[in-house]
């Protein structure tokens, strides 16, 4: 029996975005006989849960399982901000399911194709597989990595739960949080990279097509972040032209549920949100001044000027991080 196990985490406010992601996933993956959708439930209202269950009833191969966030808090045994606690709780996976493999997906995504090839990826020789991200060097060093290590974005991850349990990854996560006095650079993403750094598989970028892939060329990303190992331009082109999962990271474009969003695949999100039981109501707002300035520099200056400004910003971020 072909069974797909997927994990999301949300509260009531983010549930409509998760619903759009789930609907797109189910619409493109009818080939699976069973799809288990696990949701870490951070006080989702009964009304919203009912809407989600009603939506899933349209698909005869899907089941949604809510797991209360409150049950995971005691296991963390740390004092932290709400944001970080929810993020870290995602990795208490042995509490949530007894399956041997699970696919974690962020709520701010749309699935645009079959997940069969991704799900069937051989991860027997690693703990986690994901798409490479490009943090600044100080962010890598903050979690015990260096420029030669390949750091992944935690928005889409295929996780080997069998090895996860055998290597006591959850205990290592808690230990790392304690060693960093509750603050780990990039929160849950930094944690997963720091703990699993010697057991990470890199996936094709089409499985987590992030905003920077639409903006920057491969050689620009390598230059900007001083990366030794990265995707080819052909791989990035394929990810942009035929993404399997679109990840609406809040970079230059903004989130697709804001009226100012300029993401080239924003309409795909709107299309799937309309198929859910939730109202399509774009939020009014304005991008942060700092983002607008960076965007202006990127669009109206030679790339080396933009790169210089980003390096200056990274120095400021590094100083700020050391104060925390």
Where are these regions (language model features)?
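A glycosyltransferase accessory/donor-loop signature
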Residues: 1-4, 10, 166-324
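N-proximal low-complexity "stem/linker" segments adjacent to membrane-targeting elements
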Residues: 1-23
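Short, acidic, metal-binding catalytic loop of nucleotide-sugar glycosyltransferases
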Residues: 24-33
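Short internal beta-strands
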Residues: 35-42, 130
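A conserved acidic beta->alpha catalytic loop
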Residues: 43-47
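Active-site-proximal specificity loops/subdomain of glycosyltransferases
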Residues: 48-49, 55-95
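GT-A fold catalytic core of metal-dependent nucleotide-sugar glycosyltransferases
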Residues: 66-72, 86-136, 151, 156-159
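Conserved nucleotide-sugar donor-binding
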Residues: 156-168
């Amino acid at each position: 029996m072909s069974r797909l196990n997927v994990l999301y985490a949300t509260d009531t406010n983010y549930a409509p975005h998760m619903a759009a992601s789930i609907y797109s996933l189910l619409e493109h993956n009818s080939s699976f006989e069973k799809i288990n959708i696990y949701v870490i439930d951070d006080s989702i209202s009964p009304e919203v849960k009912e809407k989600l269950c009603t939506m899933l009833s349209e698909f005869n191969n899907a089941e949604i399982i809510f797991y209360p966030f409150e049950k995971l808090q005691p296991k963390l045994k740390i004092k932290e901000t709400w944001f970080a606690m929810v993020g870290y709780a995602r990795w208490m996976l042995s509490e949530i399911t007894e399956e041997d493999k699970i696919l974690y997906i962020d709520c701010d995504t749309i699935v645009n194709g079959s997940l069969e090839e991704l799900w069937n990826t051989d991860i027997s020789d690693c703990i986690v597989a994901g798409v490479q991200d490009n943090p600044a060097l100080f962010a890598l060093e903050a979690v015990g990595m260096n420029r030669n290590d390949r750091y992944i974005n935690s928005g889409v991850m295929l996780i080997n739960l069998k090895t996860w349990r055998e290597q006591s990854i959850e205990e290592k996560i808690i230990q790392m949080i304690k060693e960093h006095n509750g603050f780990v650079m990039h929160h849950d993403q930094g944690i997963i990279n720091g703990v699993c750094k010697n057991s990470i598989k890199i996936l094709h970028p089409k499985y987590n097509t992030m905003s920077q892939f639409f903006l920057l060329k491969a050689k620009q990303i390598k230059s900007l972040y001083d990366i030794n190992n990265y995707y080819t331009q052909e791989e990035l082109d394929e990810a942009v032209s035929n993404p399997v999962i679109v990840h609406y990271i809040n970079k230059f474009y903004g989130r697709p549920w804001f009226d100012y969003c300029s993401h080239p695949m924003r309409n795909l999100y709107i299309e799937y949100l309309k198929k859910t039981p939730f109202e399509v109501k774009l939020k009014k707002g304005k991008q942060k001044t700092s983002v607008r300035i960076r965007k202006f520099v990127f669009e109206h200056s030679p790339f080396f000027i933009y790169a210089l400004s980003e390096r200056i910003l990274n120095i400021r971020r590094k100083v700020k991080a050391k104060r925390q």
